[in-house]
Swiss-Prot record:
GO biological process: translation
Sequence similarity: Belongs to the bacterial ribosomal protein bS16 family.
Pfam family, one: Ribosomal_S16
Family annotation (HAMAP family): Ribosomal_bS16
Name used for this protein in its record: Small ribosomal subunit protein bS16
Biased composition (Basic and acidic residues): 118-130
InterPro entries documented for this protein: Ribosomal_bS16, Ribosomal_bS16_CS, Ribosomal_bS16_dom_sf
Amino acid sequence: MAVKIRLKRLGKIRAPYYRVVVADSRTRRDGRVIEEIGKYHPTEDPSVIDIASERAQYWLGVGAQPTEQVLALLKVTGDWQKFKGLPGAEGTLRVKDGAAAASPDAAKEKVAAIEAEAEKHKAKASEKKAAAAASADEAGSAAADDAEGSES
């Protein structure tokens, strides 16, 4: 059975989006598939390309042939280079400007800021707890003094 990795078209007439699928080469474009391994939204800016790298590597390894369009997507994500053993396996996939957290440095800074905020919160909570315990001790000792005074 000849297996292809190709695009399955979904969406409206002028607003297409695609699923990256593994299918028998003899089936229809939007027909029965063996497995869906990703999605591609070309109308967004930048285009959304989400391919399960592990599954793509598996299907390429067992002999599935990508179409020209899917081959271009695999090159962008770096899966084709990884499969062929070529340099550049990290790919050239762009991310939105708002997704700055995707960079490792920004993510580390964000985690450090959250941890610092958590430490401040813990410190305030422990100070409140200590103050409450101290006031309870004072109230308890005052009550004990009153009890001793009333016994006499």
